[in-house]
A protein has these predicted regions:
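Short E/K-rich amphipathic alpha-helical oligomerization segments
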Residues: 44-66
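Solvent-exposed interaction patches of small proteins and small membrane subunits
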Residues: 46-49, 92, 97
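Short, charge-rich amphipathic alpha-helices with coiled-coil/heptad character
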Residues: 2-27
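Residue preference for a single heptad-register face of alpha-helical coiled-coils
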Residues: 14, 21, 28, 35, ...
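Broad structural signal for hydrophobic residues in well-ordered alpha-helices, predominantly aliphatic
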Residues: 9, 43-44
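Amphipathic alpha-helical coiled-coil segments
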Residues: 22, 29-36, 40-43, 79-86, ...
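Charged, heptad-repeat coiled-coil alpha-helices that serve as long linker/dimerization "arms"
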Residues: 59-61, 70, 81, 91
Length: 97
């Protein structure tokens, strides 16, 4: 099995190799963003919350069980942080293109 390189794809499609690499990174980051958003949405839906703030309020008010809701909230917050990182990379790639 041979490895396909960005150079090979760029040459075959008569494109700039850097552009192929940027588009590949954008596509990968966009897919990661979609997965993160889906996972965060699943966590919020579990507690019928529209936002992290609402989930935190429900936990504080006793409307959601502390366990495992606190752990889920932490996971969702970490996902939000990762989402910010991905969005920053996407902005940089878009401005470079």
């Amino acid at each position: 099995m041979s490895v396909v390189t960005t150079r090979e794809i760029a040459n075959a499609l008569n494109l700039d190799e850097t552009e192929v690499q940027q588009q590949a990174m954008m596509a990968w980051l966009t897919e990661q963003k979609r997965r993160i958003l889906q996972t965060r949405l699943e966590i919020l839906a579990r507690y019928r919350s529209a936002s992290l703030e609402e989930l935190e309020a429900k936990i504080a008010d006793g409307e959601a069980p502390e366990h495992p809701a606190w752990e889920d909230l932490i996971v969702a917050e970490n996902l939000s942080n990762r989402l910010e990182e991905i969005n920053a990379y996407l902005r940089r790639l878009q401005s470079a293109g």
